[in-house]
Amino acid sequence: MQEIIASVDHIKFDLEIAVEQQLGAQPLPFPGMDKSGAAVCEFFLKAACGKGGMCPFRHISGEKTVVCKHWLRGLCKKGDQCEFLHEYDMTKMPECYFYSKFGPLCRHRHTRRVICVNYLVGFCPEGPSCKFMHPRFELPMGTTEQPPLPQQTQPPTKRAPQVIGVMQSQNSSAGNRGPRPLEQVTCYKCGEKGHYANRCTKGHLAFLSGQ
């Protein structure tokens, strides 16, 4: 109805001119800032942008056909110098390497599906034609299926008879060792022989006076 009453196709508003010419756009305070949420620079597409790295708009090249996977996680630091697209576009998402290699058998989720309750219980009558997802769980291997560890396969090493004899003699000498006789005990408090320090009746400074 509005086209019949008054057509505005031939009218160009000041707002449209300001947007096309990017009027009022202030340069960045310093280069290298994150411009992920900014619009695309129209002058850069025409190779006419003279602001360079100070331009507040994104400089996107035409060959960027794949979305940057690091930008999706907020980890890309290249900015406009990145060779991938910094724009959320489902048609240009990077292809999963595992999906390209294994196809539908890829274990990574590509479509949102509901897990089959019957399959989780233990049996699904629909089988492979079930419309719900049948996840594949990696079960741990049993002890009989696991390969033997390297230290278990090595034969036990035999010690030399000389070493065994030395160890036995050391153990026997350590086991037969008893308390020292009092004649060989010297008290560190008084310096006399014949008793231990805990049995000494003199003071701990008696060795200084020679008493």
Curated annotation (Swiss-Prot):
Q: Which domain of life is it from?
A: Eukaryota
What the entry lists under InterPro entries is as follows: CPSF4/Yth1, Znf_CCCH, Znf_CCCH_sf, Znf_CCHC, Znf_CCHC_sf
Positions where Phosphoserine occurs in the chain: S209
Annotated zinc fingers (C3H1-type), start-end: 35-61, 62-89, 111-137
Q: Residue ranges of the CCHC-type zinc fingers?
A: 185-202
Gene3D superfamilies, sorted? Zinc finger, CCCH-type (4.10.1000.10), Zinc finger, CCHC-type (4.10.60.10)
Q: What is its main location?
A: nucleus
Keyword set, alphabetical order:
Metal-binding, mRNA processing, Nucleus, Phosphoprotein, Repeat, RNA-binding, Zinc, Zinc-finger
Q: Which PROSITE patterns match?
A: ZF_C3H1, ZF_CCHC
Annotated Gene Ontology cellular components are: mRNA cleavage and polyadenylation specificity factor complex
GO BP term, pick one: mRNA processing
Recorded GO molecular functions are: RNA binding; zinc ion binding
Q: How does it assemble?
A: Component of the cleavage and polyadenylation specificity factor (CPSF) complex, composed of CPSF1, CPSF2, CPSF3, CPSF4 and FIP1L1. Interacts with FIP1L1.
Per the record, the similarity remark reads: Belongs to the CPSF4/YTH1 family.
Q: What is this protein called?
A: Cleavage and polyadenylation specificity factor subunit 4
Q: What species is this protein from?
A: Mus musculus (Mouse)
